């Protein structure tokens, strides 16, 4: 996987507009459909983490009960090796992903931990969170970058006392070759989106999707 670029204080990212653009709904639907399958999701997990797990049942899918309320309908959340992973597909650049993920993870931890146990003298263990965004919008972006919650803090002085980092992986054709090589489903999805974009330049999006 490509090494991510870090930028703690600047909110401006290396994203520039490129045309033509396509409606994001079809991409969201296809991505969610493909990786709701445990086998495909495990393949994606292995590619991202450079691991070689082979039992899809090792994935513990987390139910996103508050996903609709939070506008996070494209999420895939699961626990693997006592770590909690939140995968989100995005067709547009969204600098607010760290804040959205903070709201989600706080809600999820509330479900995982017995509130009464918070008043005990025993340290309550929780899954370590990991936030990954798979970006395939029409704006030019690096292979890998990071969005930080601290970028939203006003008048931040010194190191932030709270941080949340979202790793953004560009999954457009021509990006993250190693990731694509290790997850064939993701590679095929990227090829599909590229074809639709190509056809959409000369016909309606509905026709391009069906072609």
Show where each model-derived region lies.
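Elongated, amphipathic alpha-helical interaction scaffolds
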Residues: 2-211
